[in-house]
Amino acid sequence: MKYTNLLERFLDYVKVNTRSDENSQSIPSTKSQEDFAKNILWPQMEAVGLEDIHYLSNGYIVGTLRANAKAKKKIGFLAHMDTADFNAENIRPQVIENYNGQIIPLGDGEYVLDPVEFPNLKKYLGKT
C-alpha cells in the first residue's frame, strides 16, 4: 500500500473508544473523545509541523500549517472525533487486501458486510 504510515495511523485511531453518548449534555459527549484530541491528535499534529495548536471548549482541536508559498489560498481540514453510539470496546480492525467481492465478516461474525446489501462494495474489487 502506498501510504503505509497513513494506514497504521488510521488503524490506531479506530481502536480508540470515541463512542458518542446521546444522553450527555457536554460537548464532546465523552471524556474519551477529549482525551483522544489532547493525547493522541495534538502530539501527532505537532509531529507533522502544525503550530499554534489549541483544544477548543466545543471539542475541536485546531492548528496552523504555515504556507510554503506566497499568495496562495488557504485551506482547512475538518474531521469529527466521535463515533456512532455502537460498541466501541475491543475494536479489532481488519484490512481486506485485494477484495474479492465476497461477504466480509465483522468481528465474531454476528455482523457482516454483504455486497447484496451494500452494492457499493463492488467498486472495490481488487482493492485494499
Question: What are the residue ranges of the model-derived segments?
Answer:
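Conserved active-site and cofactor/substrate-binding residues in soluble primary-metabolism enzymes
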Residues: 1, 5-8, 35-36, 72
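N-terminal capping segment at the start of a domain
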Residues: 3-31
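Extended aliphatic helical segments
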Residues: 14-16, 48, 62, 95, ...
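A non-catalytic alpha/beta surface segment that caps or lines the substrate-entry region
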Residues: 25-72, 76-82, 89-99
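Active-site metal-coordination/substrate-binding segment of hydrolases
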Residues: 72-128
